[in-house]
Amino acid sequence: TSHNAGGHIHIGASILGEDVEAWRCFLKLYTAYENVLFRFIYGDKINGRKEMFKYAPPSADLIYNGMSGINKAKSISDIKWNLQTNERYAALNFCNVYFKDPGYIYGKNTLEFRSPNATTNEVIWQNNINTFAKMLLSSRDKVMDEDFLDYKLSHEYLPYLGNEYLYNNVNLKNALEFVDLVFDNNVDKIYFLRQYLKNFQENYGIETVVKAKKFIK
């Protein structure tokens, strides 16, 4: 693929539907672990493409800034008004969500996850789709501890600017927390961690997209 190519994944917002608690859990999960997700969705590269911040910049700060209102939300409309729903070029994009009826399944009603990179490797696509889908499903099924996510956000959250290293370096503690929150089997956890760790290759000071050493069969 071109070193300037990105990859977008659309998943039906109907998974969360009109369940305010499910939306709240998903938004907290994404915000708390966006830095882990970025290194993961670099895919078979160890860093993001040059145009990443134009076409797929981090979204966590935007969501975090509206979290007080999200915590008070009583309806999907309340959720919507605390999100930046017009930010089409964001890593997590809400522009295609049909907030008037988020359970709608007969047309375009999707959450868009915009990957910094593209790939022709089908295993990477499978890992990415599986991860984003399982994030939504685990949020819908309330299998995660929302109080734990609140703690993460109130005690550990750092904005992107000034802390860019969090989106590049390996943070094994956060990665292990994430897989335990999202996946219900060890196979999914292993595939995620392999793609996230990339044999612990670092990308400090690298300005061009670099292919990772082979970490999948």
Functional labels for PLM-detected ranges:
Residues 1-18:
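Long, hydrophobic, well-ordered secondary-structure blocks that form the structural core
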Residues 14-217:
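C-terminal accessory/tail domains of diverse enzymes
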